[in-house]
Structures are given as C-alpha cells and as structure tokens.
Amino acid sequence: MTLKLHDLRPARGSKIARTRVGRGDGSKGKTAGRGTKGTRARKQVPVTFEGGQMPIHMRLPKLKGFRNRFRTEYEIVNVGDINRLFPQGGAVGVDDLVAKGAVRKNALVKVLGDGKLTAKVDVSAHKFSGSARAKITAAGGSATEL
C-alpha cells in the first residue's frame, strides 16, 4: 500500500483540543473555573494585579543612570600576563595575544600595568595605561599604539 497525502495524521497527543469553558454543567461549565463572585469572576484583571498588595514592579528599586551607546570596550591585558605568556620577550602584537588566548579575535586591546615585566618586549596594542607604558619602556621595550 502506498502512502498518500490524505492518509497522513498528526502523532497521537501532539494536537490537544482547546478547552471550551462555560458550556453546560461539566467540569469547566457554569463558573468556567473562575470561582464564585468577585471581580475576577465578572471581568478580567491585569496579570500584574496582586489584590491590593503593593505590586512587584513597584516594590523593586528604579534603575538609575544610563548606558552610553558610544563607549568603546577594550579587552584588558596586564603587563604580568604578557610576561607570563611571552617569557622570551620579542615583538608582541594583538594577533599574538589572540593566538595565546589572552584576548578575543577582532577586539580592541588595552594594556594595563599590573604585574612585573622581566623580558624586553615590543608591544603593539590599541591603548596603554601610563604605568604599563612606563614598565615596558623600563624593561627596554617599546609600546606602540595601533
């Protein structure tokens, strides 16, 4: 027997009929699951209504401030991280930091001055803090902004 389009039926239990309320005296008849009397039985009330209690959206504090849409976010790398990832020194660029897993790809990189630097490194990044620039130059390296 070949399968025809008119023989197709949805899987059992996948389609559940919508409960029709207020039709006769059955389980969802008469009061239709609304109880007896009161506002909720006679008309709809908002979902947020809590029966005279102070609603949750008014109990919570308001959010202050704003989020600047034009802020530039930088991935942070400390001088100590560079020292740990590149102990031999040399030229360190953003691509090298991505390859070592220190920063994400296509991210702007800022170098901060936390930690010690022992090897001479020539770092190129998008931004440097003053202390990071001082530590890199003190170790004999150079800090180049992209």
Curated annotation (Swiss-Prot):
Keywords assigned by UniProt, alphabetized: Ribonucleoprotein, Ribosomal protein, RNA-binding, rRNA-binding
> What is stated as this protein's family in its record?
Belongs to the universal ribosomal protein uL15 family.
Q: Any idea what this protein is called?
A: Large ribosomal subunit protein uL15
Species of the source: Mycobacterium tuberculosis (strain ATCC 25177 / H37Ra)
Q: Where is the composition biased (Basic and acidic residues)?
A: 1-10
UniProt-listed PANTHER family: 50S RIBOSOMAL PROTEIN L15, LARGE RIBOSOMAL SUBUNIT PROTEIN UL15M
This chain's function reads: Binds to the 23S rRNA.
- Which first-to-last residue range defines the signal peptide? none
- InterPro entries per the record? Ribosomal_uL15, Ribosomal_uL15/eL18, Ribosomal_uL15/eL18_sf, Ribosomal_uL15_bac-type, Ribosomal_uL15_CS
Locate the region Disordered: 1-41
